[in-house]
A protein has these predicted regions:
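Cullin-RING E3 adaptor/co-adaptor recruitment helices
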Residues: 2-31, 37-42, 68, 80, ...
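Ankyrin-repeat inter-repeat connecting loop/turn
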Residues: 72-76, 94, 127, 159, ...
Length: 452
């Protein structure tokens, strides 16, 4: 053997040492060791046999590769899940899969390999190591691997440590199977009101935004603040009311989840009229998303129906500016609820735009027109409705455009006078009137699919 060289151990054939920089400067999330207690830098592993065994969860092979005297405090290079734009030459950009740093512990936690995780921890893997910005506990929570979460917490993993995006493990309990992970985190000391570093979101904000009813219930029972504010001034109730319908088929289920969340939050003491920095309130957001049942719930709590946001929009404006997917959620019910609670009517000059926008929802047009004593449309308004829509709703649009040239019926005019007289107390006074149910429904703008 040449002088000055030593024989390499089996590990050193495959492991290259990283630069001898303190761990905190290399990885960012590790705390600096105190002076006089240096910590060795993790070893960079390029052994494909080891990596394959980790990704497949081959416990027997890993027991061979990690004998009792070895260490599992290693760093692996893995390819990013998504390509990123990068420039290696001036002016030339390409999509490349960047290399990301991880550890055997992260791989086992992200794939739910519980026994592998136990083996690595016995081989001195550090539970809070985060070379890529996340700890193994973050990865286990993302995957909903409850057993792995428990093993890591018992091993001393920090339940409140932030990742590279400033999110704590509890913020990442979002998908299926993560409710049990959240319960474990809370049992081991996770802060129920811990905020993410940039957005200042609490776990309750995340649960409300994603429509996770069971998780929101758990967090509230463990003391989560129902009126916590994020960096934009949003409360969990605002986040819940902004739940979007992804498709017409999902409309009913989305509104049901949103309603359940709002009931939970209001029962826990959430402010039903809390506004964000742009003065948007839960009612504005529920109307924009077309959640009729949520709108009625908020109105029953006494929220201000005519409050304006920073742009001067009321809840009725928001309802009429909603996305096309709101058609599947019966926007006419939102508009009717607002008008029956004293919402200021649409400016007559804007009615042609409303007709053009909502012509495929004739009941929305009907309930709006029934709040005026006369028809407020120009004769050329018929051209705003596509011929196909006119044909599909021939009876309604025939009655609508006939009234452009003639007065409304005496019955309708009487309704307008009574509603105007009771304007300030309309929702409370109408049900108390000694009138037949059918007439009460008429006064409350019941749908008839025709105008007269």
């Amino acid at each position: 053997m040449p002088r000055g060289r030593k024989s390499l151990s089996p590990w050193e054939h495959h492991l290259g040492c990283l630069p001898s920089t303190p761990a905190c400067r290399v990885w960012g999330l590790q705390s600096c060791p105190t002076q006089g207690t240096p910590q060795p830098s993790p070893l960079l592993c390029r052994d494909m046999a080891l990596q394959n065994a980790l990704y497949t969860g081959d416990l027997a092979r890993l027991q061979e590769l990690f004998p009792p005297s070895s260490t599992a405090d290693l760093v692996l290079e893995s390819q990013a899940a998504e390509p990123r734009w990068s420039s290696h030459q001036r002016g030339l950009w390409s999509l490349t899969y960047e290399e990301e740093l991880t550890t055997p512990l992260h791989v086992a936690a992200s794939r739910g390999h519980t026994e592998v995780l136990r083996l690595l921890l016995r081989r001195r893997a550090r539970p809070d190591s985060a070379p890529g910005g996340r700890t193994a506990l973050h990865e286990a929570c993302v995957g909903g691997h409850t057993a792995c979460v428990h093993v890591l917490l018992v091993a001393g993993a920090d339940p409140n440590i932030p990742d590279q995006d400033g999110k704590r493990p509890l913020h990442l309990c979002q998908g299926p199977g993560t409710l049990e992970c959240a319960e474990l985190l809370l049992r081991f000391g996770a802060s129920v009101n811990g905020q993410s570093e940039e957005e200042k979101e609490t776990p309750l904000h995340v649960a409300a935004r994603l429509g996770h009813v069971e998780l929101a219930d758990l967090l509230l029972r463990r003391g989560a603040c129902p009126d916590a504010r994020d960096s934009e001034g949003w409360t969990p109730l605002l986040a819940a009311c902004d739940t979007r319908c992804q498709s017409p088929a999902d409309a009913e289920a989305t509104t049901t989840r949103c309603l359940q969340l709002c009931r939970l939050l209001l029962k826990a003491g959430a402010d039903a009229d809390a506004a964000d920095r742009d003065k948007r309130r839960p009612l504005h957001l529920a109307c924009r998303r077309g959640h009729a049942a949520v709108v009625e719930l908020l109105l029953s709590c006494g929220v201000s129906v005519n409050a304006m946001d920073y742009g001067g929009h009321t809840a009725l404006h928001c309802a009429l500016q909603g996305p096309a997917t709101a058609l599947a959620q019966s926007p006419e019910n939102v508009v009717r609820a607002l008008l029956n609670h004293g919402a200021v009517r649409v400016w007559p000059g804007a009615l042609p735009k409303v007709l053009e926008r909502w012509c495929t929802s004739p009941r929305t047009i009907e309930v709006l027109m029934n709040t005026y004593s006369g028809m407020r449309l120009p004769e050329e308004a018929m051209g705003l409705v596509p011929p196909e829509t006119l044909q599909n709703h021939q009876r309604f649009y025939s009655s609508l455009f006939a009234l452009v040239r003639q007065p409304r019926s005496l019955q309708h005019l009487s309704r307008c006078v009574l509603r105007s007289h009771l304007a300030s107390c309309l929702p409370h006074a109408l049900p108390l009137l000694p009138l037949p149910p059918r007439l009460l429904r008429y006064l409350q703008l019941d749908f008839e699919d025709v105008l007269y």
